[in-house]
């Protein structure tokens, strides 16, 4: 499985409410038309004391995660007419974007069917660092009331290809998706945590 994850910042002249509604109601259905798309979620960043200073400084509003069977399917989708339509629509609400192509690895299988409250961790670093990702996973496994953990090993990252949206100059050594049953569980687990990873609290919307 290959995951294409975008780091999205909304346009300065678009309110957070308008950004969320357009992303969910207009852009989301366009993405669902991609050939070969196996799974698609939108992770909407929400305000929380568990969101640390590193994350706040990046001003990221959302993380779309698109999964394909392999890189051939991903490249086919990214060169499709459906992707071209999405690139045009993105101009209406996205101000800057970066894309990270990853190999997802389930480190802790979800213990409940649906977990919509999650922590997205961007590990500090200019390039992929599998050892750092493994260390983060070992630490995250010890969090109280953890119900799921997915690691995203970085294969490539940079500007979104064929996009006319400005590039968001953010790099990462790896990503982790840490799931909890509730926002209360997440915030209690992260209270007092000190890390150089950027921690974003997100609400997940599954579209496919």
Where do the PLM segments sit?
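Macromolecular interaction modules
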Residues: 1-208
């Amino acid at each position: 499985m290959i995951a294409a994850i975008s780091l999205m910042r909304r346009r300065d002249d678009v309110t957070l409410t308008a950004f969320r509604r357009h992303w969910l109601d207009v852009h989301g259905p366009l993405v669902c038309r991609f050939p070969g798309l196996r799974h698609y979620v939108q992770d909407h960043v929400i305000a929380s004391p568990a969101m640390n200073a590193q994350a706040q400084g990046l001003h990221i509003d959302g993380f779309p995660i698109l999964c394909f069977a392999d890189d051939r399917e991903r490249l086919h989708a990214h060169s499709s007419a459906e992707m071209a339509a999405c690139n045009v629509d993105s101009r209406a609400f996205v101000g800057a974007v970066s894309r990270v192509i990853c190999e997802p690895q389930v480190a802790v299988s979800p213990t409940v069917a649906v977990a919509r409250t999650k922590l997205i961790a961007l590990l500090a670093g200019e390039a992929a660092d599998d050892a750092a990702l493994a260390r983060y996973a070992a630490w995250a496994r010890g969090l109280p009331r953890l119900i799921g953990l997915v690691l995203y090993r970085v294969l490539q990252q940079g500007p979104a290809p064929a996009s006319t949206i400005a590039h968001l100059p953010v790099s990462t050594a790896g990503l982790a998706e840490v799931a909890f049953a509730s926002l209360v569980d997440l915030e209690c687990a992260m209270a007092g945590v000190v890390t150089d990873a950027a921690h974003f609290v997100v609400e997940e919307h599954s579209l496919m």
